[in-house]
């Protein structure tokens, strides 16, 4: 009897080892198969379609499904206009939009980064081939609204929660439907370009938020400085001048200059600051630094002052660089800058992924708010807020005024040469809503429009303030 029990114990042990080895082999083979399919996919739409046939879902923070797999087919938001508005963020399974959730979160959606024990548990439960589900920080209603606001423009909208860094809406125009990308038809010029993340725009007068912060924190400069604005006359040889107000603003101090967006004042201020100090404050706000959004890549905003002379420095100080100088900003970064001012000078790390869960509902990732850059002192941010409120209430940003809302912001216009060699003027607005219940920062860039960014931004904030945001 004892011999029988020993034999039974040995047989049981061998069986357990055999099953463990078999499961390990299955895990390795499954992982290898996924990797081989991914490597072989390249531009092969049909291979990618197979890979994504069991991929996890992508949902908005308010529970609307933006992408999911159903009976071996990858499907996108049921509301076609929402699917269109979400194209640049969600992407599609063909990876023609390489900087999208479908591509940069591929491992999570396919579940290919799981450990052996995690995969074993799912295999035993019968859902080992299913990917993980992702919940994004964006709100479906805000995404849809942003898409509608951009319908008649070329440009971008970014809306953030400035206390958490959560991305609430991101939209670009032009755009197309996901199925058009999959079928590769009806693709209009520029419709696949993610302007919000990849756009390198001249900041125009929105850069004056940075030069003002530098002035407020410069102990040797007089914040009560006055400058006589002579309109279209250059402040120094080859230097900044008024392009939209040729008659000039007269003698102005900081508040009036900020309200009227006076190039003469801020050109003189840039010269007084000098390249090193101007550059340092810009870098405090994230220029020449990496800005991340989860797994997404974002174009680095640049402030590279190579052109010699005071004239070039004065133009850089008003966001319209000349010669070898480079000053660019992405809409995503512009919204984060506005949010930093709203958040007492602290820029929060931007988030796009709220939560990741496996097929059994276990939470694998949950977003935590994190401070990113200390941009300026809290008292500097408070003074900037007063100046930005003045811009909206009685200055260049009056189009952003809305009854019952306290909106602070800064307008910008930037001249650029298009592909046809013609001068176009882009319209920019960066601002935020002063509200405990809706801490919202927004950036709008409209190409070839010199006025409407403030209107679009305020419409976005007004709508966002009217709904409950999870």
Tell what function each PLM region has.
Residues 61-62, 163-204, 210-446, 465, ...:
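Beta-lactam-recognizing serine transpeptidase/beta-lactamase-like catalytic domain environment
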Residues 1-184, 191, 200, 276-284, ...:
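Periplasmic/cell-envelope proteins involved in peptidoglycan metabolism and beta-lactam response
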């Amino acid at each position: 009897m004892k011999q029988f029990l020993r034999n039974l114990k040995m047989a049981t042990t061998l069986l357990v080892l055999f099953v463990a080895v078999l499961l390990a082999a299955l895990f390795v083979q499954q992982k290898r198969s996924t990797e081989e399919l991914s490597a072989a996919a390249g531009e092969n739409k049909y291979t990618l379609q197979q890979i994504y046939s069991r991929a996890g879902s992508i949902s908005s923070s308010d529970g609307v499904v933006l992408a999911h797999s159903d009976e071996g087919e990858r499907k996108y938001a049921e509301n076609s206009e929402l699917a269109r508005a979400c194209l640049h963020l969600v992407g599609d399974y063909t990876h023609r939009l390489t900087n999208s959730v479908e591509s940069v979160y591929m491992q999570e959606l396919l579940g290919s980064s799981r450990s052996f024990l995690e995969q074993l548990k799912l295999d035993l439960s019968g859902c080992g081939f299913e990917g993980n589900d992702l919940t994004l920080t964006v709100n479906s209603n805000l995404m849809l609204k942003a898409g509608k606001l951009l319908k008649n423009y070329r440009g971008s909208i970014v809306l953030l929660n400035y206390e958490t860094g959560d991305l609430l809406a991101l939209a670009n125009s032009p755009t197309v439907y996901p199925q058009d990308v999959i079928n590769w038809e009806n693709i209009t010029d520029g419709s696949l370009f993610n302007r919000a993340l990849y756009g390198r725009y001249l900041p125009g007068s929105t850069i004056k938020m940075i030069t003002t912060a530098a002035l407020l924190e410069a102990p040797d400069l007089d914040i009560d400085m006055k400058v006589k604005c002579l309109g279209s006359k250059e402040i120094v040889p080859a230097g900044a001048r008024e392009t939209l107000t040729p008659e000039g603003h007269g003698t102005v101090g900081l508040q009036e200059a900020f309200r009227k967006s006076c190039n003469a004042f801020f050109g003189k201020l840039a010269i007084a600051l000098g390249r090193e100090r101007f550059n340092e404050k810009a870098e405090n706000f994230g220029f020449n630094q990496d800005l991340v959004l989860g797994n997404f890549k974002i174009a680095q905003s640049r402030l590279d002052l190579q052109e010699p002379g005071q004239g070039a420095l004065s133009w850089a100080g008003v966001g319209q660089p000349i010669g070898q100088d480079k000053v660019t900003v992405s809409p995503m970064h512009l919204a984060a800058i506005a949010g930093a001012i709203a958040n007492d000078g602290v820029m929060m790390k931007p988030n796009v992924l709220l939560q990741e869960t496996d097929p059994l509902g276990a939470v694998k990732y949950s977003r935590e708010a994190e401070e990113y850059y200390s941009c300026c002192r809290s008292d500097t941010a408070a003074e900037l807020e007063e100046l930005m409120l003045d811009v909206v209430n009685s200055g260049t940003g009056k189009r952003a005024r809305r009854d019952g809302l306290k909106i602070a912001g800064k307008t910008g216009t930037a001249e650029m040469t298009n592909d046809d060699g013609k001068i176009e003027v882009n319209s920019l607005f960066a601002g935020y809503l002063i509200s405990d219940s809706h801490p919202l920062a927004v950036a709008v860039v409209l190409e070839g429009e010199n006025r409407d960014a403030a209107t679009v931004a305020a419409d976005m904030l007004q709508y966002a303030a009217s709904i409950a945001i999870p």
